[in-house]
Amino acid sequence: MTPSIGYVDEDENGQKSKFLRSSDDPYRLSIEEVIEKFETHLENGLSDEQAKSKLAKVGLNNLGADEKISISKILAHQIFNAMVLVLIISLIIALAIKDWISGGVIGFVVFINIFVGFIQELKAEKTMGSLRSLSSPMARALRNGVDSNINAEEVVPGDIIHIKVGDTIPADLRLVDCMNLETDEALLTGESLPVAKDHEEIYDYGAPIPVGDRLNMAFSSSIVAKGRGTGIVVATGLDTEIGKIAKSLKNNDDAVVVKVDKSLNPSTKDYLIAVIKTTKNIIFNVLGTNVGTPLQRKLSWLAILLFWVAVLFAIVVMASQEMRVNRNVAIYAICVALSMIPSSLVVVLTITMAIGAQVMVTKNVIVRKLDSLEALGGINDICSDKTGTLTMGKMIARKVWIPNVGSYLVQNSNEPFNPTVGDISFNENSPKFIKETDDELDFIPHLPSPTPILFEKWLHIATLANIASLNQIQNEMDGSIEWEAHGDATEIAINVFTTRLGYTRDKLIGDSLEHLNEFPFDSSIKRMSTVYKDKDGNSTVYTKGAVERVLSCCKYWYNPELTALSEEDKLLIESNMNALSSEGLRVLAFAQREINISKENVSNREVVESNLIFLGLIGIYDPPRPESAKSVKLCHKAGINVHMLTGDHPGTAKAIAQEVGILPHNLYHYREEVVKVMVMIANEFDSLSDDEIDNLPVLPLVIARCAPQTKVRMIEALHRRGKFVAMTGDGVNDSPSLKKADVGIAMGLNGSDVAKDASDIVLTDDNFASILNAIEEGRRMSSNIQKFVLQLLAENVAQALYLMIGLAFIDKSGYSVFPLSPVEVLWIIVVTSCFPAMGLGQEKASHDILEQPPNATIFTWEVIIDMIAYGFWMAVCCLVCFVCIVYGKGDGSLGENCNEGSDTGCNLVFRGRSGAFAAFTWCALLLAWECIHLRLSFFKMRPELENPWWKQLAIDLWDNQFLFWSVMGAIVSVFPVVYIPVINNKVFLHAPIGYEWGLAVAFTILFLIGAEGWKWFKRVYYRKSNANNPEYDLERNDPFKEYSSFSKSNTMEIV
């Protein structure tokens, strides 16, 4: 019975297009079944009526409507976060009680927070437009028996499409005919080489077939690299493989609305639970507690916590006044509440990240989403694509084996097209012997001299059975000489190798050789041959191709004399091929023979490619970037695990992973079941349930033949283990995982626009090493964020304690007099502290920042305790300063109505506020300098240097000039604020002072002494605790420790 085809009536995404639904996969069907299923005809195609009818059912062949930038959504995102909402509530209350000055200052702070965030997010906002640009604009379709070019959007299932070299495939095709057809699917599957197609292949229903292995299919947005073909359209729009990826990008995994599955006959209770969960999600989304990076979520929770603490303190204020709430009490309550809110934190954080993003541009990293920069500091797992990221994305000859001569090895070749770069070494043994021997066999750097005759014969084949070109050109910009190549990637690699040894086609042909014939590479035959005649009249056949296809044409080989090729000899050659393949190399064989053109027909391929003499093998591969191994090692040293998720074959993936250090070089020392977990094929991983994956003692380091969903599941598995994950990729197939990861990192040079749109960060040089630059900058920012969060929150703690204790100061009318006015509180929090906090955000990274473990959180116990300690000591110093002024030299008179204006009798209170304000300001500024290092003394932040303390202090302070001038400027700003008329007594509610300056300075110095004493205590404590485990660093920096330590009993069987 022929499988049926149906159409879904509704589009779950609200698009006009309707989805094709089939009961069987086209790649499992014969061509005849596909023709019948899609109601088409190979010779005539669809009729216009059929095409019109199907277009009405399935819709246009595109990926949906444009998503435009939503100004309102960006603005709402800035307003609806907990920190800003708390400030807005304070603003409303201040205006409600007609405290215009405080309300104006709070309003300005709210505006700055919203404006800065809005501008930054507007710049980063991207659309899905580039995804649609991948579609082929035109397609060559057969309709009504006539070939015609139609708009690709009008292609429908059942259309007969013709494709040729250079075409972008307009839809998913089931191939019905192809000639040497190869398609580049790197952006879709991650496969580094073009995929040879075979329309006659049919797959059974027994096992799942990854997209990259469906050789009878050609996929939408792939590019035809070689040959031509014809196919039946089996999927369009969002039903194509690329469409499925686009659909997954559009679907919001963190949907706010919880839907009820009506097919399960839900009860009223189910609907009620869904409503409760939806309401909870909406509230948490508005407050920002379940969106954004870990730091943003923690800050949102912090804002909520501080809001309720502020409410509690406000209630305490009112209770202390026996609930007699008048304007004075309300102002004091607002003042206490504001002292708990780090008003400048959001804007400082945003500006610091914006500056960090500008710095990253100089390090080949473009930050699309500022949030991700802070998030990089906490990354402890990187899932990386292979092709073009860890590797160069170009092919290089790695090894050559000539029987009875030995093996040649190419090393240090980091310029694929440059034959002058790199070293060739030699070993007289075969690849099989080198692999199997227990001895360390070194390759000697000197090649045999003179060149062995068999190697010379092989070089002639490699040079003449090759149509790739290699040329030197002059760079127009700087005049330097560069190498460029044209042709098949495999042939270019061989050409570069032979040119390296002085063998080029022009030199060999010259005036001595005549090209008689050529049989091009055919995907069904998998070999190519050329025939040349020399000036003596002798003709020679030169052949190269897939090992099994060349061996089938060979009758002889040299062992060491020319001898017949037996079955044992072929098995030996195949074992050497397997040895090269196990290293991740693509292996080709080479053969030749002399041909008598007077007796044999050189136009007959079967005749020419017979009775050949086998001469050797070559192994080529896409080599790792020179810096990849070092970068992976640094990642391990930084406590970051690196996983390779690639569409390539297992052998290639495993070999590259070992070469760059993702897998241990001594993999043979590990038990078989451990290696099975370390290296898995996507089908193995995908066959496991989430529970089975979670029960694995460790997650795989390498997964080969990855489909997009495999990468997403790997990231989800890491998330379930509490990991913070970065994902790198360049292809369309990487987009869902880039979006799913905590930080998505796309390639800028060769990456698809789709991947860039789904990413948070783009590498402009496609270099894995640049990820380390991003992580280093992320860690620097996380460290600096920790510093200014400590500075700002310690000030909040100090002000809250100061004002709460200040409730004890009761004036003549029985109301509390606040020892700092609301504007003084806001001035210290917003103006005085804001710029030094930005300065802390620009601190340079410590020299060992990549040798430290990832920053799991900003709010460590050390930071929390520091916050309380510094805040308490600052409050004590400033409160004692106020008391000394009012009750020491003063008579203790607190006047009346001093919270609103400078009435009679308020002079002493105003002078006390001025002294305390100066002390508070200067203590806060010194705290900024103290926060440069959480433990080291302010006077010796670099103990490894031998400079005198005063000289080193001057160097350290001047090193961050923004922070230096911010602190100095804020120190000086106290004087005009205290002395300028009207501003002092009407706005700040304080008065000019004299001897009180001395007290302010004295208590500032006392705060500095206390802070230094606290740091000294911490250094002693951590020195003792860190001395307990001297081998900790060695254990922490062993990336494979957990793989080598889990026992056989808790290892899961992988089948």
From Swiss-Prot:
Any GO molecular function: ATP binding
One biological process term in Gene Ontology: sodium ion export across plasma membrane
Topology within the bilayer: Multi-pass membrane protein
Cell location: Cell membrane
Summary of the knockout phenotype: Reduces sodium efflux from cells. The rate of potassium efflux from the cell appears normal.
Induction and repression of expression: Induced by a combination of high pH and sodium ions.
Residues binding Mg(2+): 385, 387, 730
UniProt key word ATP-binding: yes
InterPro entries the record matches: ATPase_P-typ_cation-transptr_C, ATPase_P-typ_cation-transptr_N, ATPase_P-typ_cyto_dom_N, ATPase_P-typ_P_site, ATPase_P-typ_TM_dom_sf, ATPase_P-typ_transduc_dom_A_sf, HAD-like_sf, HAD_sf
Keywords: ATP-binding, Cell membrane, Ion transport, Magnesium, Membrane, Metal-binding, Nucleotide-binding, Potassium, Potassium transport, Sodium, Sodium transport, Translocase, Transmembrane, Transmembrane helix, Transport
Annotated TM spans: 74-94, 100-120, 299-319, 329-349, 790-810, 817-837, 867-887, 914-934, 963-983, 991-1011
Signal peptide (UniProt feature, chain positions): none
Cofactor: Mg(2+)
Main localisation: membrane
Annotated binding of ATP, by residue: 387, 491, 544, 586, 646-648, 705, 711, 733
Catalytic activity: Na(+)(in) + ATP + H2O = Na(+)(out) + ADP + phosphate + H(+); K(+)(in) + ATP + H2O = K(+)(out) + ADP + phosphate + H(+)
SUPFAM superfamilies: Calcium ATPase, transduction domain A, Calcium ATPase, transmembrane domain M, HAD-like, Metal cation-transporting ATPase, ATP-binding domain N
Active site positions: 385
Main function: Catalyzes the hydrolysis of ATP coupled with the export of sodium and potassium from the cell. May be an inefficient potassium exporter. May transport other cations such as lithium. Sodium/potassium efflux ATPases are involved in salt tolerance and maintaining the membrane potential across the plasma membrane in high salinity (Na+) or alkaline (K+) environments.
Protein name stated in the entry: Sodium/potassium exporting P-type ATPase 1
Organism field: Schwanniomyces occidentalis
Lineage: Eukaryota, Fungi, Dikarya, Ascomycota, Saccharomycotina
